[in-house]
């Protein structure tokens, strides 16, 4: 008798409706198109986001709740795909939860985060180089979340992949990790950049993008760059909106199916 299978995505989540629909939803839809025969479910890890959405009438389960629901539905083989970009504390918590549930499934498979290996870092660099064309006097600054976790190393790894490909005009920074504006401003000066395209290196263009990256506050990336005399053009576009990034998540799913 064939095992009952299903696909579960797990995201941090966002309360921004457009980002939830176009960016998280864009990734989810690409995955569903790849395996239309599998029942699909989603989970959000942020209690705050789940509470806000519940107040609006949209219930999204936690990972633990979603796993219990899959067990109740009789699922034996579950493919779990996180939309997280890097192997940080959030991903570690997901992995720990999965391990605690593993004995209760016949086959429970967890995909790595998007930038969980060198091949995917290089693939994402290729997508970014295609998205952001080189223009004289212009630099592109992409800002990720950042973390104190060793997984923060994926940001300089991505920068290395871009630089080795000859695209040193695309710079990678973080909100809460390294490098920050103080590290990137001297690089922009050496490059002679006059204009900066400022965009999030995040799945969704939510609160971090609108406040910490492109917000009006004095400590935002936009304000710090403008204070240095640069002309800044924010582009509030989450990575999940890009079809090429959606395809990278599909590649992660295909790896999971082949295990």
Model-found features: residue ranges?
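Active-site-proximal alpha-helix that buttresses catalytic centers in soluble enzyme cores
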Residues: 1-259
